[in-house]
């Protein structure tokens, strides 16, 4: 028996040492390995190259079998740099796919694609591992009931509600609040649903991954004093990694999330940033394996690869994985095969607006651009649906009137339009909300607003009952009662000033 070399530290399953081969060819991150007749590894088996380079430095490279070439050769993709490898080096077939640590011990830790901790906090204290390749849950295991996943964030719950076990696309440029929104969702799922989160950094900037980790520590999402009380596990395969690592890191994160769903029976949030990089890495690997490219140079297996990842993200009778995926749209072309294939799997889109961020309205979720398949009367109920539609109509009318206001001013509008504008401005401000994770920056205590409270608040604004209140009373508050109290305080303050 020997330790599984695909992961490190405690809690690694042991595998019988299987077959040995030799490197026959190296093409960048791709290796051809020759095995003795009848000793060929299976597709997706993990191979390990151990030895020393010409300078005497130790080498330990893990690869994944992608093709069986014939003549007792296989083609494998490396999960780390192939620097220093030479022909003839010994390769060990572990006899199983890549396996990664799973369970509560992963919370608060950072892992690479192989499930190795990279945060210098020592080995992971778990004996449970799981292979990253597995079938999607069977139809009989799926929970087909449509239910809303309440986030406690007003703009999301009212206008673009998330489906429990659904997939949400998160669109937004740099600096509009993606990270803070992600951290608030991680915080709220832990408090309201007793759930945990897994963050998969797929092919994005290492600096951003580091910033996210530091901000999570600062806001308490990761508890440095008691790491077991952390609410999130982080898995990174960043831009500088070989394409094999970037292609598989999403599966590593998903495998950790599946354990929380299937064994711990929890509601899990899975973040993937960025799903486009998963496709991009697959395209690079496909070219290295010599496959004929398809439309726009993408891999011919694009839909299959995307489907095998997305179909595992679902609700079962045990628990749910709700996935929020940042989507990069190359050259803003929504018809590009990568985003187009992603859209087919999404249940909702949350679009962050730079214009709203510039106004200081956070979360800067665009209420008119964000959509959800869940916003139907038979799913959310007539009251929720009617309120959401009226809010959108009011905001749309305000948007149409903005050019007239900019040129002629408010006084030139009809009485009805002036009332619409006043209510729309109150709605716009009431869609903002103080976040728990931003408390350390803003000094304002965070607020979790239940769906029923959210609907009641917007109904009161639309009914005209609050027309006499100043619009600043609705800015950065939780429920409508707080807005009313703030309006009273503002009135008292203005009287005292007089």
Curated annotation (Swiss-Prot):
Matching InterPro entries: AAA+_ATPase, ATP-synt_VA_C, ATP_synth_F1_bsu, ATPase_a/bsu_AS, ATPase_alpha/beta_chains, ATPase_F1/V1/A1_a/bsu_N, ATPase_F1/V1/A1_a/bsu_N_sf, ATPase_F1/V1/A1_a/bsu_nucl-bd
SMART domains linked: AAA
Compartment list: Plastid, Chloroplast thylakoid membrane
Highest rank taxon of the organism: Eukaryota
Record-level GO BP terms: proton motive force-driven mitochondrial ATP synthesis
UniProt keyword terms in alphabetical order: ATP synthesis, ATP-binding, CF(1), Chloroplast, Hydrogen ion transport, Ion transport, Membrane, Nucleotide-binding, Plastid, Thylakoid, Translocase, Transport
GO molecular function: ATP binding; ATP hydrolysis activity; proton-transporting ATP synthase activity, rotational mechanism
One Pfam family from the record: ATP-synt_ab_N
Keyword Nuclease on entry: no
Chief subcellular location: plastid
Membrane topology of this protein: Peripheral membrane protein
Enzyme class name: translocase
Keyword flag Calcium: no
Annotated ATP binding sites: 172-179
CDD domains for this protein: ATP-synt_F1_beta_C, ATP-synt_F1_beta_N, F1-ATPase_beta_CD
One cellular component (GO) term of this entry: proton-transporting ATP synthase complex
Enzyme Commission (EC) number: 7.1.2.2
Catalysed reactions, semicolon-separated: ATP + H2O + 4 H(+)(in) = ADP + phosphate + 5 H(+)(out)
Quaternary data: F-type ATPases have 2 components, CF(1) - the catalytic core - and CF(0) - the membrane proton channel. CF(1) has five subunits: alpha(3), beta(3), gamma(1), delta(1), epsilon(1). CF(0) has four main subunits: a(1), b(1), b'(1) and c(9-12).
Family stated for the protein in its record: Belongs to the ATPase alpha/beta chains family.
Listed PANTHER family: ATP SYNTHASE (PTHR15184), ATP SYNTHASE SUBUNIT BETA, MITOCHONDRIAL (PTHR15184:SF71)
Function: Produces ATP from ADP in the presence of a proton gradient across the membrane. The catalytic sites are hosted primarily by the beta subunits.
Protein's name in the database: ATP synthase subunit beta, chloroplastic
Species assigned in the record: Nymphaea alba
Taxonomic lineage from the root: Eukaryota, Viridiplantae, Streptophyta, Embryophyta, Tracheophyta
């Amino acid at each position: 028996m020997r330790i599984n070399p695909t992961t490190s530290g405690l809690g690694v399953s042991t595998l019988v040492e299987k077959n040995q081969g030799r490197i026959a060819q190296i093409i960048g991150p791709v290796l051809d390995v020759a095995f003795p007749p009848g000793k060929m590894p299976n597709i997706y088996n993990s191979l390990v190259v151990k030895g020393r380079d010409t300078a005497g430095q130790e080498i330990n490279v893990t690869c994944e079998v992608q093709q069986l070439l014939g003549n007792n050769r296989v083609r494998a993709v490396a999960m780390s740099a192939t620097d220093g490898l030479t022909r003839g080096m010994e390769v060990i077939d572990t006899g199983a796919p890549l396996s990664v640590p799973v369970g509560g011990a992963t919370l608060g830790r950072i892992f690479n694609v192989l499930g190795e901790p990279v945060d210098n906090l020592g080995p992971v204290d778990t004996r449970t591992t799981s292979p990253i390749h597995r079938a999607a849950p069977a139809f009989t295991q799926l929970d087909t009931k449509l239910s809303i996943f309440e986030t406690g964030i007003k703009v999301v719950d009212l206008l673009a509600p998330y489906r429990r076990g659904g997939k949400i696309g998160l669109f937004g440029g740099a600096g509009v609040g993606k990270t803070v929104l992600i951290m608030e969702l991680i915080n709220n799922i832990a408090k309201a649903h007793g759930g945990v989160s897994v963050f998969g950094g797929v092919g994005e900037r290492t600096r951003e991954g580091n910033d996210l980790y530091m901000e999570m520590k600062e806001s308490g999402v990761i508890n440095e004093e008691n790491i077991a009380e952390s609410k999130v596990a982080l898995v990174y395969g960043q831009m500088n990694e070989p394409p094999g690592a970037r292609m598989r890191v999403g599966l590593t994160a998903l495998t950790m999330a599946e354990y929380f769903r299937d064994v711990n029976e929890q509601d899990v949030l899975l973040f993937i940033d960025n799903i486009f990089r998963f496709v991009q890495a697959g395209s690079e690997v496909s070219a290295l394996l010599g496959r004929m490219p398809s439309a726009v140079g993408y891999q011919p297996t694009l839909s299959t690869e995307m489907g095998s990842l997305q179909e595992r993200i679902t609700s079962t009778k045990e628990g749910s994985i709700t996935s929020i995926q940042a989507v990069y749209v190359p050259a803003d072309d929504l018809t590009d095969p990568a985003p187009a294939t992603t859209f087919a799997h999404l249940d909702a889109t949350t679009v962050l607006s730079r214009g709203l961020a510039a106004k200081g309205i956070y979360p800067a979720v665009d209420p008119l651009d964000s959509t959800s398949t869940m916003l139907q009367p038979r799913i959310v109920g007539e009251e929720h649906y009617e309120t959401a539609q009226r809010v959108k109509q009011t905001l749309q009318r305000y948007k149409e009137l903005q050019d007239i206001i900019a040129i002629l001013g408010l006084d030139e509008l009809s009485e009805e339009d002036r009332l619409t504008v006043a209510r729309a401005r109150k709605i716009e401000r009431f869609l903002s909300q103080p976040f728990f994770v931003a408390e350390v920056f803003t000094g304002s205590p965070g607020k979790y607003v239940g769906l029923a409270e959210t609907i009641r608040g917007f109904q009161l604004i639309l009914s005209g009952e609050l027309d006499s209140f100043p619009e600043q009373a609705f800015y950065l508050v939780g429920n409508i009662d707080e807005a009313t109290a703030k309006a009273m305080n503002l009135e008292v303050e203005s009287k005292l000033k007089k």
